[in-house]
């Protein structure tokens, strides 16, 4: 028989973020973490190539439009050591431009190679004030780690989780009669 252990573990991580936290009426900044694109395919075919975390980009669009005065940072460099020219920011810039978002309103941080660097480099760019409301858009399974890194670096971010991999009422064994 097949027991979906991986799904169960992801569910345990994601469940904390199933309900979107109420977004404040005023949002001063939006931080979108990279990892939703395939820079190699983008470079090869000159087409936007999104991966299984595409919601990071797609779901950011209505948020960017709603809070059009907010500072927006897309953070994603290259995770490929010998190819620093292949970053997520390049693909994201093309994506936003293609769907009609003014790319001048987005700051593309393209040096980070991992979540830690996403937070560190983006915080330097954001220079957040203590009373500012900053949203963090990333995958639900990635949110806790990103928030822990931000907290350790004195940056209070409001989670806006996307890219869920499991339904809200996931059960490891849905029906014992099936066993």
Enumerate the language-model features and the residues they cover.
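A structural signal for short, hydrophobic/glycine-enriched beta-strand patches
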Residues: 2-177
């Amino acid at each position: 028989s097949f027991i979906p252990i991986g799904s169960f573990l992801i569910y345990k991580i994601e469940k904390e973020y199933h309900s979107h936290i109420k977004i404040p009426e005023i949002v001063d900044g939006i931080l979108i973490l990279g990892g939703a694109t395939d820079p190699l395919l983008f470079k090869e075919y000159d087409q936007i190539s999104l991966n299984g975390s595409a919601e990071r980009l797609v779901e950011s669009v209505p948020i960017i439009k709603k809070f059009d005065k907010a500072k927006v940072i897309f953070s994603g460099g290259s995770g490929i050591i010998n190819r620093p020219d292949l970053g997520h920011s390049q693909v994201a810039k093309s994506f936003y431009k293609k769907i009609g978002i003014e790319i001048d309103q987005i700051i593309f941080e393209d040096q980070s190679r991992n979540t830690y660097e996403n937070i560190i480099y983006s915080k330097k760019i954001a220079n957040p004030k203590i009373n500012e409301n900053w949203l963090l858009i990333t995958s639900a399974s990635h949110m806790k780690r990103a928030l822990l890194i931000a907290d350790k670096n004195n940056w209070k971010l409001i989670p806006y989780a996307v890219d869920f991999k499991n339904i809200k009422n996931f059960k490891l064994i849905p029906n014992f009669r099936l066993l």
